[in-house]
Amino acid sequence: MNRMFRLAAVLATLAVPLPALADPIAATLYKNPQCSCCEGYAAYLRENGFTVDVKPSNDLAQISADAGVPADMEGCHTMFVDGYVVDGHVPVGVIRKLLAERPQIAGITLPGMPMGSPGMGGEKAKPFTIYAVTKDGAAPKVYAVE
């Protein structure tokens, strides 16, 4: 009987999705009020264990600039998570890498609105290049390719 109980406990644990086992990661996402892909990105984050507070704003360029994201590297929206800026449709795996490594940067960005990225429609045409940004004006450097 004890063996059956242990087996049932193990199987029940495996049935729980992994994001549900971890504490949710709180994020604040600033987006253009008319943008629907940003809502898709927020839903993607929620499905992957984030709690997302979506804030419509008509001042995204300034929010990104204040966070250290150069104008030519801006993504579709700007998010803040655990002291970092995450600009654009950055995949969750790269955000988790950022939070685990805790590098001395302002954050990361996936410039533009690449097709096939989380929250965007279409198929992924090529790997996404995510850049690290700083507030000191240094040129962005490749942080991850996914």
Q: Where do the protein language model's features map onto the residues?
A:
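Local sequence-structure signature of Cys/Sec-based thiol-disulfide redox active-site neighborhoods
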Residues: 22-48
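Residue-level detector of anion-binding/catalytic polar loops
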Residues: 51
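Thiol/selenol-based redox catalytic cores and closely related redox-interacting motifs
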Residues: 66, 72-146
